[in-house]
Amino acid sequence: MGNVFEKLFKSLFGKKEMRILMVGLDAAGKTTILYKLKLGEIVTTIPTIGFNVETVEYKNISFTVWDVGGQDKIRPLWRHYFQNTQGLIFVVDSNDRERVNEAREELTRMLAEDELRDAVLLVFVNKQDLPNAMNAAEITDKLGLHSLRQRNWYIQATCATSGDGLYEGLDWLSNQLKNQK
């Protein structure tokens, strides 16, 4: 009987954990986002070869965020990070019109993976501070997000350097985690 109360108490008050995989094409802003969330400041980044991993505490949830390099030569390695991923953050450079179709292809390929079938999808439309940036509606269309009928997804306009939109995205992720059984 005590076990029932312990489980109830943990579900109501215990810290939840969520494993997040953050991917996207190179130079989309993934590492800048990770360290803005972790440290609250802008860090000087270099292209990620391999990965960065940090734990971000937010609203009683411990997000373990894996930031995986996005250069085309290392994208085949993304699949090694899929296992046990509950949330996928796909970062798009909203100013990079030439590569938005490439981003769509990579996202489509990933979402077809069986290991990610239950992962929720958060798309960060990054670099909204730039004058020619595509807005969230335009990116939704270009990525074909409306065709994702079997997946819970959300799109959020962001600016990694100022932090705009990042916590709104984490709010959505935390609500998804709370709604999971």
Swiss-Prot record:
State the UniProt keywords alphabetically.
Answer: ER-Golgi transport, Golgi apparatus, GTP-binding, Lipoprotein, Myristate, Nucleotide-binding, Protein transport, Transport
- Record function comment: GTP-binding protein that functions as an allosteric activator of the cholera toxin catalytic subunit, an ADP-ribosyltransferase. Involved in protein trafficking; may modulate vesicle budding and uncoating within the Golgi apparatus.
The cross-references to CDD domains, in alphabetical order and at most eight, read: Arf1_5_like
Protein's UniProt name: ADP-ribosylation factor 2
Which residues does the record give as GTP binding sites? 24-31, 67-71, 126-129
Which BP terms does GO give this entry? protein transport; vesicle-mediated transport
Report the sequence similarity comment from the record. Answer: Belongs to the small GTPase superfamily. Arf family.
| Record's GO cellular component terms | Golgi apparatus
Q: Has the keyword Repeat been applied to this entry?
A: no
Q: Where in the cell is it found?
A: Golgi apparatus
Which superkingdom, per the lineage? Eukaryota
Fetch the Pfam families from UniProt.
Arf (PF00025)
Residues anchoring lipid (N-myristoyl glycine): 2
List the Gene Ontology MF annotations in alphabetical order. Answer: GTP binding; GTPase activity
- Which species does this protein come from? Mus musculus
